[in-house]
Structure formats: C-alpha cells, structure tokens
Amino acid sequence: MAKKKAISWIKLQVPAAQAAPGAKIGQALGPHGVSGPQFVKEFNERTAKMEPGIVVPVIITVYSDKSFSFIVKTPPASILIKKAIGIESGSKKSNTDKVGTISKEKLMEIVRIKMPDLNAKSESAAFKIISGSARSMGVEVEK
C-alpha cells in the first residue's frame, strides 16, 4: 500500500470532548476538503476521558485523498496554571502586578501533565520552563 501524501497541517485549540462543527473548525478544515462533522466526532471520542471543556491543542494532518489524522496535545501551561490557582487571566503587567501565588507541588503536577509535550530531558528542566510561564503571567512561585 502506498504511503499517503500529507498536503497540509492545521493547528487548532479546541475544548476537550465539546467540539462542535461550528465556524472555527469549519473555516479551518473546509478549504482542505476535510469533513468537519467527521473530525468533531473522532475528536470528541478521543478526548472523552479528558476534563470536558479544557482547551487542548490539536494538530490535524490532511492527506491528498482528503482523509486526515490528528494528534491531541496536552493543554497549554497557561490554562493549567490559571485553573490551579483559580484565576480568569494573567497579569497585564507581569513584572509589577501579581495575580496570585502557586505552590511548587501544584507546579510539579502541571509539569507531569505537560512533560510529553515539553522539550526537556528532566523534570527539573521542565519545572523551570513551567515556572517561567507562571512568572510571565504574573503568578509568583513559592520558594
């Protein structure tokens, strides 16, 4: 069997288990000839075990025969940090206005969730990446 030729890659951020064939997904997939409802059905099945509504990045590969495959990534660190400390958004001026504090334990939970998608060889390196994300949002990391 011949290998399918990938013609396009589409990156989206979609709520887990709650995708709907609406404008955002339709506008992204339509120009490539991919069936929006088919993607939504498969995406919702694959993300059913995740927390409903948490936004997850998905990379869709479109092939020359209009078929597709996709990879679901872990939720963005900023969303996990906001959820962990219960805030709506990060600080507009992260270096002066602090919006909250996060414990090292909560940060390590986020590191363990994000580890498959991070470019880090160890948990301590990943901790530095995630704590940097927290600081850039105006969230203080406990010492």
UniProtKB/Swiss-Prot annotation:
Which Gene Ontology terms cover its molecular function?
large ribosomal subunit rRNA binding; structural constituent of ribosome
Function per UniProt:
Forms part of the ribosomal stalk which helps the ribosome interact with GTP-bound translation factors.
Q: How does it assemble?
A: Part of the ribosomal stalk of the 50S ribosomal subunit. Interacts with L10 and the large rRNA to form the base of the stalk. L10 forms an elongated spine to which L12 dimers bind in a sequential fashion forming a multimeric L10(L12)X complex.
Q: What modifications does the entry list under PTM / processing?
A: One or more lysine residues are methylated.
PROSITE patterns per record: RIBOSOMAL_L11
InterPro entries cross-referenced by the UniProt entry: Ribosomal_uL11 (IPR000911), Ribosomal_uL11_bac-typ (IPR006519), Ribosomal_uL11_C (IPR020783), Ribosomal_uL11_C_sf (IPR036769), Ribosomal_uL11_CS (IPR020785), Ribosomal_uL11_N (IPR020784), Ribosomal_uL11_N_sf (IPR036796)
Recorded superkingdom: Bacteria
A GO CC term assigned to this protein in UniProt = cytosolic large ribosomal subunit
Any one GO BP annotation for this protein: translation
Can you name this protein? Large ribosomal subunit protein uL11
Q: Which UniProt keywords apply?
A: Methylation, Ribonucleoprotein, Ribosomal protein, RNA-binding, rRNA-binding
Into which family does the record put it? Belongs to the universal ribosomal protein uL11 family.
